Amino acid sequence: MKPLKLFCIGLLLCPLVCLLLETAPPPSALLTLEVKEKTGLKSDAMGVFAIRKNTSDINRQVSGLQRPWMTKFKNHLSDFFKSSIPPAAIFALFVTTAIMRAAIVNKRLEEPHRQWTIDQRSSLEMQNMNLIKLFGG
């Protein structure tokens, strides 16, 4: 493979790796509880946190009932994309796109313009040249 193709493939894999690393499933709650108990932290603190978290979720759901459905749908999509795609992957994708575009433009500037010979012309071009010769052009 050419070095430019390998470079482009590597740059395309960068956002994918960022996406896969940051969206790895978190450890289960049971495993987290066991680790905290082993380290000596009280499990009561986790229970209080869970109650606070549930209260904020309920408040969000109750206040959401008064909004129009289109706004709720937009917020749902926004939350979905924010939670599923990490910002590092989005940034890496933009940087990759910019670098690839610059590399492709640079490659085009380096290549000399190709000169066509008569043998490489298409048959339609050859027919047009024959017509020009016939009619004295």
Curated annotation (Swiss-Prot):
Keywords, ordered alphabetically: Cell membrane, Membrane, Signal, Transmembrane, Transmembrane helix
Keyword Cell membrane carried by entry: yes
One Gene Ontology CC term in the entry: plasma membrane
Keyword field contains Chloroplast: no
InterPro entries: Smim9
Membrane topology: Single-pass type I membrane protein
Domain of life: Eukaryota
First-listed, main subcellular location of the protein, grouped into a coarse class: membrane
Ranges in the topological domain labelled Cytoplasmic: 106-137
Compartment(s) of residence: Cell membrane
Leader sequence residues: 1-23
TM annotation in the entry: 85-105
Topological domains annotated Extracellular: 24-84
The protein, known as: Small integral membrane protein 9
UniProt organism field: Mus musculus (Mouse)
